[in-house]
């Protein structure tokens, strides 16, 4: 829509579409209404001379009104048009990071980190420009660490390029896949208040490529992406058979819903938590719009029912599946959808097996993610690959949970048997429960093995660590 002087404007009730297309990495705008697309297209292309400044400021106020997390305040539309800090974080990594030292440099805990709107495909070619700006702020550069991705002074000031979104509060334990972020995947981050203030006080843009025929803000070397987080977004195209909304802040309400479905004819549930729900207090119309989409990076857990004792094979409904979608802090949707090959879900980088729902038949052991006790059967088990989900209470491990089973002669065990404590006659026995869940039983009594006893060193680390937590609780924090 055009305003006075033929400048493009945008109605407030269309701000949700601007947020959808600019905060996320949305490849396909096909489902966005045509009316706001002229403004949105020019906003994304940074052709601000065609846009009404009043609308830009109103949109910034819209972001403030939803209390968008880490947002840097401004009273000028220059925050859209030049390289500016837009989100402020504090690097709070208090433990030792095991990093992939290709692009990342050491940053002191407590250092303020500002995410700017500048993106590039080649940080090395931006270094001369940024180092010159750095030199305007810091004259003494004795303790500077420089590489092709940044320049850091004494671990607490400078600049660097990294992914569009970095968890500055987390501990990165291994190399994570870089998100496919169009042609300019690297974002400029400013370290320290002095560097941020320099870019706030001055309207700065990098020099344009020498072969550029026009001086467009977005070009082959760099571009501005305003108030952009970069989570990859796709349109949901499920065939919904039925749906129910649930409003609650109580996890037990959700566990009851899962329990009810798993005790029906449903063999599993896909539980999805959107990875942006804590970013803001999203207005209802924006939440409704986001419900039509899904981020690839959202967290998805496949939750199955656990059967301890043998029973006839469960006949589950296989033409449809159930999704429990947490789309805001206290809002969920339970969707019954057709099971179709075209259904798209969040990417599961976690290559573990599905989660096992903690039913009323057993209790999870405190401090573990894969150990439980079944009072009725008086068995204690450690899952070999799965994790437990949905416990409303836990119990402490105590040796009394291991009932001593007397037998003369000793019971002869087949399969893999591991010695835990030879004097106390405690063993770990490989076991597969009736619905094909691999596990180990922790047993105590008069047993012997039909083959050589195995060492605990032969166990996979997932089981080994849990066993250590149970038997030596202070050994693993």
Swiss-Prot record:
GO cellular component, one term: host cell cytoplasm
UniProt entry tagged with the keyword Transit peptide: no
Domain of life from the UniProt record: Viruses
Entry keyword set: Host cytoplasm, Host nucleus, Virion
Cellular compartments annotated: Host cytoplasm; Host nucleus; Virion
Purpose of the protein: Required for occlusion-derived virus (ODV) envelopment and subsequent embedding of virions into polyhedra.
Annotated protein name in UniProt: Protein AC142
Species this protein is from: Autographa californica nuclear polyhedrosis virus (AcMNPV)
């Amino acid at each position: 829509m055009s305003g006075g002087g033929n400048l493009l404007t945008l109605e407030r009730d269309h701000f949700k579409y601007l947020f959808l297309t600019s905060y996320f990495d949305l490849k396909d705008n096909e489902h966005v209404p045509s009316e706001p697309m002229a403004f949105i297209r020019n906003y994304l292309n940074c052709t601000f001379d065609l846009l009404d400044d009043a609308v830009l400021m109103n949109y910034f106020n819209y972001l403030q009104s939803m209390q968008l997390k880490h947002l840097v305040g401004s009273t000028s539309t220059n925050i859209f048009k030049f390289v500016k800090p837009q989100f402020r974080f504090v690097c709070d990594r208090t433990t030792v990071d095991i990093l992939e030292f290709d692009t990342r440099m050491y940053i002191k805990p407590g250092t303020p980190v500002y995410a700017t709107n500048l993106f590039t495909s080649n940080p090395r070619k931006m270094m001369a420009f940024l180092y010159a700006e750095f030199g305007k702020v810091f004259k003494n550069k004795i303790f500077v660490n420089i590489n092709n991705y940044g320049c850091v002074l004494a671990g607490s000031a400078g600049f660097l390029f990294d992914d569009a979104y970095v968890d500055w509060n987390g501990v990165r334990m291994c190399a994570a896949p870089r998100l496919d972020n169009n042609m300019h995947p690297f974002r400029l981050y400013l370290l320290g208040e002095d560097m941020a203030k320099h870019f706030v006080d001055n309207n700065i843009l990098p020099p344009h490529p020498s072969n550029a025929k026009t001086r467009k803000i977005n070009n082959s070397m760099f571009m501005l992406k305003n108030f952009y987080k970069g989570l990859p977004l796709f349109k949901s195209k499920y065939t919904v058979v039925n749906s129910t909304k649930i409003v609650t802040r109580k996890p037990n309400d959700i566990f009851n819903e899962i329990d009810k479905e798993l005790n029906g004819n449903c063999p599993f549930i896909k539980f999805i938590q959107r990875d942006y729900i804590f970013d803001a207090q999203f207005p209802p119309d924006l939440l409704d719009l986001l419900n039509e989409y899904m981020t690839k990076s959202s967290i998805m857990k496949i939750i199955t029912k656990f059967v301890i004792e043998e029973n006839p094979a469960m006949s589950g409904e296989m033409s449809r599946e159930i999704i429990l979608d947490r789309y805001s802090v206290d809002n969920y949707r339970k969707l019954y959808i057709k099971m179709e090959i075209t259904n798209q879900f969040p990417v599961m980088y976690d290559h573990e097996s599905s989660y096992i729902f903690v039913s009323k038949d057993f209790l999870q052991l405190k401090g573990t993610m894969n150990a439980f006790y079944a009072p009725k059967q008086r068995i204690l088990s450690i899952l070999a690959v799965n994790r437990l989900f949905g416990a409303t209470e836990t119990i402490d491990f105590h040796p009394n949970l291991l009932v001593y089973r007397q037998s003369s002669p000793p019971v002869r065990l087949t399969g893999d048997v591991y010695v835990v404590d030879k004097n106390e006659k405690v063993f770990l026995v490989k076991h597969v429960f009736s619905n094909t869940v691999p596990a180990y039983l922790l047993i105590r009594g008069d047993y012997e093995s039909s083959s050589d006893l195995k060492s605990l060193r032969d166990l996979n680390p997932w089981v080994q660590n849990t066993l250590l937590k149970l038997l030596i609780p202070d050994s693993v924090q």
